[in-house]
Amino acid sequence: DDEGETWTQADEVPFTKTLTDISCPSQNKCWATGHDATILHSFDGGKTWEIQYQDIDFDAPLLSIHMYDDYEGVALGAFALSLRTANGGISWDYLFIDDDEFQPHLNYTYGDNQGWRKSARDEGYAVGELGKYYVTDDRGLNWLAIETGYMGSYWSGIKVDEGQSLLLGMSGNVTLATLYGLNDPIPPDKITSIACYESGYYRGDCKVYAFDDIFIGTKNSLTNADLLDDGRIVLSGNGGVISVVDMIREKNIKTCVRSDRLSNTSVIPLGIDEFLIAGESGVRKHSMKECYENYVSENSTSQDAFYEVSIN
């Protein structure tokens, strides 16, 4: 309630193992995923929780959840574990996303939280091992598995514009995924992939994506992203990395490496320049301005590092 200044423990959480992700489609209703294929649900904005789904025998974590509204959503996890609900979690049904025999971990799923257009509310995305990028147009009923040309793991992703997502991976790998029309000209130097729906309402519809690598100046893995109020994207990563990506105006990436070098797991914007960073150092406010001033000031005792690279 006070932009992260104070925190209180939830009154009731009937689960003692690791929780991995949270999705709150409305003010009071929230869902969280965790180990033992567990899904928790809150009716009061996170004050109290109940176990809504659990499969201890599966012995694998659910890693991410995205609720499109108070009724429909998907939860994804290790070994291609995929669940979907259409009734607010009263029941969760197994979902088929990828026929890869390797059963890649599905690390993160997200939607169009910015609402560029109404139909985008039905769109969903996911990323995982083997550089896989997944797209759905019907709230997770049917998915396209799209090859990106990257063989590492993507840990997170975010929709940054209509038809575009940033995919965040291992060792500082960031990929811009751009949707093209079937007859649109695509520069020959881009990695491209086409996939077609085999069932459902969109059966036979095909999508063409092109992928660009974006160098942000770090080899640390990137863990989470969110949009600032002015359209820039803030990224968090291991080793104290925080980056702000400006793809519209300055076309650059400013990266701060905090002096404690402790890893960041999540980021929440607080306007244009400030954001909350959560990770090994706890939860605290941070700003790129403060990092830059520490770096250039001769009197500063901070060991923060700051650098800037251009987006080609």
Model-identified regions with their sequence ranges:
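Residue-level hotspots at or immediately adjacent to binding/recognition sites across diverse folds
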Residues: 1-312
